[in-house]
Amino acid sequence: MQRKHLPVCASLACALSFLALSCDDYDKWTTSPHAILEMSADTLAWDTLISTVPSTTKVLTVYNNGDRGLRISKVHLGKKALSPFRANVDGQSLFQGEGEDFEVRRKDSIVVRLECTLPETGQSGPVRMEDELLFTLESGVQQRVLLSADAQDAYVIRGMVLQQDSVFHTDKPYVIYDSLRVDSGARLTLLPGTTLMFHDKAGLDVYGTLSAEGELGKPVIFRGDRTDRMFPYLPYDNTPGRWEGIRFRSSSVGNTMTYCDVHSGKYGVVCDSTSLETLQLSMENSIVHNIAGDGLRLTGTSAVFANTQVSNTLGTTVYIYGGAYQFVHCTIAQFYPFEAERGDALFLSNHVDSVYNHLYMAHFINSVITGYGDDVIMGSILEGQDYRCDYLFDHCYLNTPAVEDDERYVGVVWDDKEQPLRHEKNFRLFDTDNFLYDFTPDSLSTIRNMAMPEAAALYPNDRLGRCRTCDSIPDAGCYEFVSQ
C-alpha cells in the first residue's frame, strides 16, 4: 500500500527542491559595477513654492531590471541635515538626510517619496534651491537624482479681520488661510501688481470697501495657492474651485476693481443686495475666468462693468436678479470645458418664485454674449406696471434666437446658423487640451466692426491697451482685433 504513495512523495520532493533552487536564485546578489539602478526620473522639480509652506509629495521609483539583486549601502541627500528636501526610501525616512542598507531584488523596485519645505530667502522674487539624492551601491557605484524648487517668500495671513484702512504692497504675494475679512468702515487698498493667493476654503469677504488698483501690465491677481501641477501639462492654477471667491456684503459700497484677474475660484464675484443710491462695484479692464460656480452673481444692487471678460463658469457666467447694471465693451463667454451641464452665459430675472426684485436697469452695450449651444441667454421676467424690468442690448453680439424687439435689441448681430463663424470660432485661441483661451476676435470674426462708435469713445482702448477708436467701426467685446 505504501508503494502507491511513493510517486507523490517523489513529486513533492522535486517540487521542494525546485522551489529551493528558485529561492536561492532569487536571493542572489551582485556587486558588479556594471549592475546599476534605473530611476523613473533623473530630476525632480517642483514649481514655485511658498517659503516655509510644505510642498506636495513627489514619487521616484527605483528599478532593478537586472537578473541579480542589488544592495544599496547608503542613500543620502547631498546637504544631509541642512537640506530643505526630505526623503522616505522604501518606507524608511532618512534621518538627518541619511539612510543605510536598502535592497532591491531582481526585476523589482522600491519607491522613494520626496517633499520639501523651503526657507525664506529675503528676496522679492523666486530663488532656485537645489540638492541631490545620492544612492551608493554595494559595488561603490554612486547614482544621483537632482532635486530643485523655487522658493517664493510671501506674507502668510490666517483668519485676518481688517478693522482699519490697510494697504497691501507688491514686494511679495499674500497667502491667505481661513479667509480675509474687510470689516465695515475699513478700506483695503491693493496696489498695482499685488497678488493674493487663497488656500482652499479661503476667500475675500468685504463688509467695508475694496480698492483694487491694478494697471496695464501690473494686474491685481486673486487666485488659489496651489503652484504645482495636476498633470505635467496642466497647472492647478488653470483648474476651477481652488479657493472660494470675492463677496461684497450688503454694507459694502464704493468698491473699485481695475485691471484685476480673478480666476479658478468656487465663485467669482458676488454682490449682495444694497441700496441703489450708491454704486456698489465698478469693475474695469478685468477678468473673471474659470470658475466652479457663478462668475458674477448680482442681487438687487448697482454695478458698472467695462472692458471686462467674464468667462468659462460651471454655474451662470453672469447672474442678475434685480438691481441696476451697465456692461460696456464686455465679453461674456460660456465655454466651460470641464462639464457639459454648464450654466447659461447670462441669466436675467426680476423675481424668484413669488419674491420680486425690480430690475431697474440691465444695459449691455457693445458687448459679446456667447458660448456653446444655440441659446446661452436665459431669464425669468415678469412684466407689467407692478414689475420694473428695463433691459437693453445695444450693438451686441448675442448667442440666442433672434428677437423682434427694436426697443430692447438695437443694432444686434445674432449668432445664428447664417453666420460664417459661430461660437468659439470667432476667437483667436481655443486650446481645450491645455485650457488656454484668447477671446480676441479672429481676423474673420463676426464680432468685428459692429460696435457703436459713440460708446467706444468712452473706452478708447481695449482691455489690453490696444486702440479701439483707430478703426472707423470698433469691435464688440473687451478686445479689439489686431493683426499678429
List the model feature ranges, each with a label:
Residues G78-E98:
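Short, solvent-exposed loop/linker segments at beta-strand-coil boundaries, enriched for Pro/Gly
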Residues V62-G66:
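Asparagine-centered strand-capping/turn motif at beta-strand->loop junctions
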Residues M1-S11:
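Bacterial N-terminal signal peptides that target proteins for export
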Residues D24-T30, L37-T48, V53-V59, Q96-Y437, ...:
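Beta-strand/loop edge motif enriched in small/polar residues
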